[in-house]
Amino acid sequence: MRGWKSKRIVGLHEPQVNEDHLAACGLPDDRRLRLLSFNIQVGNSTQSYRHYLTRSWQHVLPHKGRAGNLDKIGDLLSDFDLVALQEADGGSHRSGYINQVKYLAQQGEFPYWYQQLNRNLGRLAQHSNGVLSRLRPTAIEDHPLPGPAGRGAILVRFGTGPDALAVVVMHLA
C-alpha cells in the first residue's frame, strides 16, 4: 500500500478547466454569488442514523446507487456559483474509478474546479475536498491542517486587494 501513496503538493495551484463549460463563466445578472457547502459522503445516500452502520460497507466498496446519487447532486449543484465539496472520492475502486470532483464539475457545468487529495489509499480510497466555481479563482492554496495526517484546507481567492473574496474549504473530521 505504501507504493500507492503520493506526496501532497502544498502551496499555490491553478484550477482545472472544463473547456466545454466556459460559457457558464461568471455571475448571474443579479450579481449575487450563490454559495453551497456539501458533504457528499462519496455519493452515498443516508436517510437515517442506522444507515451509518447498515450501509457502512458503501464507504469502501462500489454500489449501484452511487452513480444516480451523483447525478442528483450534480443537478442540485447547477443552481450555485461556488461549491465546496467534502468527502469526495478522487477516483478509487469504491467510486468506480471516477474522480467525483471532476464528475460533479462536469454535471453542474462548472468551468473551474480543484480537487484536494487529503488521504490517498491508492485503489482503495482517495479522500478529497473540492471546489467548483463559475468564476475563475485568482489563487488556490492547498494547506494541510495540524493534527492527524490526511486533513486539509483549500483557500480560494477571487480578485485582489481590499475587495478580494477569500473562501476556505475544509473538512474537520
Model-derived regions: residue spans:
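A short, structured active-site edge motif that brings together acidic residues
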Residues: 110-123, 143-145
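Hydrophobic pocket-lining residues within nucleotide cofactor-binding pockets
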Residues: 40, 88, 137, 145, ...
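Conserved beta strand-loop-helix elements of the APE1-like EEP
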Residues: 106-108, 123-140
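Short beta-strands and strand-loop turn motifs
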Residues: 84-87, 114, 168-170
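Loop/turn elements at helix/coil->beta-strand transitions in domains of secreted/extracellular proteins
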Residues: 79-82, 109-112, 163-165
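Generic recognition of short, well-ordered alpha-helical segments
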Residues: 95-99, 127, 142
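Beta-strand-turn-beta hairpins that frame and shape the catalytic cleft
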Residues: 24-35, 133-138, 149-169
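N-terminal, active-site-proximal structural segment of metallo-dependent hydrolase catalytic domains
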Residues: 1-107, 118-122
